[in-house]
């Protein structure tokens, strides 16, 4: 366990590959020596472990096990536990089927590429007027547009800030009898996106092909507009310890006791979306779920301020990403910042609670659901963006966009 943790923290090695290598050498130890004693190992044992991996795993996995076996041996040599000579992984890295031009590789590439009809459907939806699109539609089509502009991991979308667009003017070259020269007469505007690379490289500008610039600009503009109110709420919470005066908040003093309807508005529950009966019933459920009194004149904004801040996401003002090696993005800067239930048609948006979509949110909208209803053996009725817009059961994964761009580049 200590070795696995050491390699994960210090060398960023994949835990699964490290464990598979340990298991391979463990098997050889037990077969040859009847016990696990690393001091008895010889070079031939590592050859046998690599051969075992070749027999039990597919070529790409076996290669990585062999690579990890070399790392393990080098580690043992460094600590002087073993006095063996250097060892080379005998397993060759399999040819990249994305590049090789044989029939099998061609079929492999085709299976990895996105359905052309699905891409055209997404393009058609993206081209619609903004007024025709729901926030969920804007999220999906804009995210896909960005993924088609640069071969980035889909999970890195959510590290983007609202000011991710980078523009600069560059001097182009022209032909002359002396070859290509910069004569100062041609200035071209180029556009890039500041992406955050998860593998410890920080933010880096990836320039966009000129044909994609209008699409990227529109996608980012839509996302900025969609995230404007959540980002503003986060900003208000950052700059002051008072109750954040968002759009629904009643214009009353902080210490004035509130009616139930005012409490609901202050906590981001838009009562105007319901009739009187629905507002009464749904409002009670909402308040009870948050341990807020349902009677009139029980609490003021000062009281609600404490309750609201206690419900803020972990690590606020920063978004609590599960990946990204500690990337720091404030909610007030996050391009994909949203409110709770903002994408849910059956529930009202909560305008005082922050939420961030994830890679799963995007994938769920690109492929027919596999989720089952809670407590039942039947699928939920969640529709993909294709189904919502009448394009049938198209299915596509976020990783396929990256394969498409890499295939075009090759």
How would you name each of these model-derived features?
Residues 80-83, 147-179, 410:
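Short, charged phosphate-coordinating catalytic segments
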Residues 1-108, 145, 159, 218, ...:
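Charge-rich, intrinsically disordered N-terminal extensions
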Residues 40-46, 115-126, 372-387:
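Active-site-adjacent bridging/hinge elements
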Residues 95-124, 201-214:
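DNA breakage-rejoining catalytic core of tyrosine-based enzymes
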Residues 117-150, 154, 400-402:
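Basic, Lys/Arg- and aromatic-enriched nucleic-acid-binding interface segment
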Residues 32, 128-134, 150, 250-403, ...:
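Short, basic (Lys/Arg/His-rich) helix/loop patches that form interaction surfaces
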Residues 47-63, 168-200:
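Long amphipathic alpha-helical scaffold regions
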Residues 183-185, 189-192, 197-247, 252-253, ...:
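Extracellular/surface-associated beta-sandwich interaction domains
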């Amino acid at each position: 366990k200590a070795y696995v943790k050491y390699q994960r923290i210090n060398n960023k090695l994949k835990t699964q590959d490290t464990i598979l290598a340990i298991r391979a050498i463990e098997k050889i130890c037990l077969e040859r020596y009847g016990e696990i004693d690393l001091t008895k190992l010889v070079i031939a044992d590592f050859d046998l472990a690599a051969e075992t991996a070749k027999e039990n795993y597919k070529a790409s996995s076996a290669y990585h096990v062999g690579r990890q076996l070399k790392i393990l041996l080098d580690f043992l040599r460094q600590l002087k536990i073993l006095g063996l000579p250097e060892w080379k992984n005998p397993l060759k890295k399999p040819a990249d089927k994305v590049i090789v031009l044989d029939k099998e590789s061609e079929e492999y590439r085709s299976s990895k590429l996105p359905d052309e009809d699905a891409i055209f459907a997404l393009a058609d939806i993206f081209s619609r007027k903004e007024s025709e699109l729901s926030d969920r539609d804007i999220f999906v089509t804009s995210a896909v547009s960005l993924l088609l502009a640069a071969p980035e991991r889909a999970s890195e979308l959510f590290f983007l800030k609202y000011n991710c667009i980078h523009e600069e003017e560059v001097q182009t070259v022209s032909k002359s009898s002396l070859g290509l020269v910069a004569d100062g007469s041609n200035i071209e505007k180029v556009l890039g996106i500041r992406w955050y690379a998860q593998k410890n490289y920080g933010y880096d500008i990836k320039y966009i092909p000129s044909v994609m610039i209008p699409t990227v600009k529109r996608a980012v503009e839509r996302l900025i507009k969609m995230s404007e109110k959540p980002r503003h709420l986060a900003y208000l919470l950052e700059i002051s310890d008072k109750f954040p005066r968002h759009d629904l908040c009643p214009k009353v003093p902080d210490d004035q006791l509130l009616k139930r309807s005012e409490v609901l508005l202050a906590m981001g529950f838009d009562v105007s979306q319901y009739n009187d009966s629905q507002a009464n019933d749904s409002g009670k459920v909402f308040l009870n779920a948050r341990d807020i009194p349902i009677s009139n004149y029980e609490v003021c904004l000062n009281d609600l301020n404490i309750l609201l801040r206690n419900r803020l996401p972990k690590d606020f003002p920063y978004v609590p990403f599960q990946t990204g090696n500690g990337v720091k993005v404030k909610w007030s800067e996050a391009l994909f910042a949203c409110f709770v239930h903002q994408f849910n048609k059956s529930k009202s948006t909560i305008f005082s609670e922050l939420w961030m979509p994830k890679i799963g949110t995007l994938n769920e909208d690109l492929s027919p659901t596999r989720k089952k209803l809670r407590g039942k053996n039947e699928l939920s009725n969640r529709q993909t963006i294709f189904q919502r817009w009448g394009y049938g059961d198209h299915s596509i994964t976020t990783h396929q966009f990256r394969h498409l761009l890499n295939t075009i580049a090759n």
